[in-house]
């Protein structure tokens, strides 16, 4: 799947120490992610971006969430039921 590491570019926008290495993504921990607009490239990456956005400092906007909708119906509602501050904006 040629786009499977596209999410790495997105988390780098947040300040993550990350890179791709052939068939692997290498991500090192940092103290705090800074919010930035990011784009979902597939179902799992999109869900991961939303979850990481919950701990990022500031407001995170995730675009192309239709990918998430395909695999996780009621994703936003489920996160809200767990106490997450997340909303869908049209």
Curated annotation (Swiss-Prot):
Domain of life: Bacteria
Catalysed reactions, semicolon-separated: phosphoenolpyruvate + UDP-N-acetyl-alpha-D-glucosamine = UDP-N-acetyl-3-O-(1-carboxyvinyl)-alpha-D-glucosamine + phosphate
UniProt pathway: Cell wall biogenesis; peptidoglycan biosynthesis
Any one Gene Ontology molecular-function term assigned to this protein's record: UDP-N-acetylglucosamine 1-carboxyvinyltransferase activity
Localisation per UniProt entry: Cytoplasm
Position of the signal peptide: none
Swiss-Prot/TrEMBL GO biological process terms: cell division; cell wall organization; peptidoglycan biosynthetic process; regulation of cell shape
SUPFAM superfamilies cross-referenced by the UniProt entry: EPT/RTPC-like
Role according to the record: Cell wall formation. Adds enolpyruvyl to UDP-N-acetylglucosamine.
Family to which this protein belongs: Belongs to the EPSP synthase family. MurA subfamily.
Annotated protein name in UniProt: UDP-N-acetylglucosamine 1-carboxyvinyltransferase
Upper lineage: Bacteria, Bacillati, Actinomycetota, Actinomycetes, Mycobacteriales
Protein encoded by which gene: murA
């Amino acid at each position: 799947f040629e786009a499977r590491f596209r999410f790495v570019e997105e988390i780098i926008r947040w300040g993550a120490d990350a890179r791709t290495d052939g068939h692997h993504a290498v991500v090192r921990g940092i103290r705090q992610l800074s919010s930035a607009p990011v784009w979902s490239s597939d179902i799992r990456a999109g869900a991961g971006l939303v979850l990481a956005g919950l701990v990022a400092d500031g407001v995170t906007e995730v675009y192309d969430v239709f990918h998430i909708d395909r695999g996780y119906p009621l994703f936003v509602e489920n996160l809200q039921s767990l106490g997450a501050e997340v909303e869908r904006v049209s």
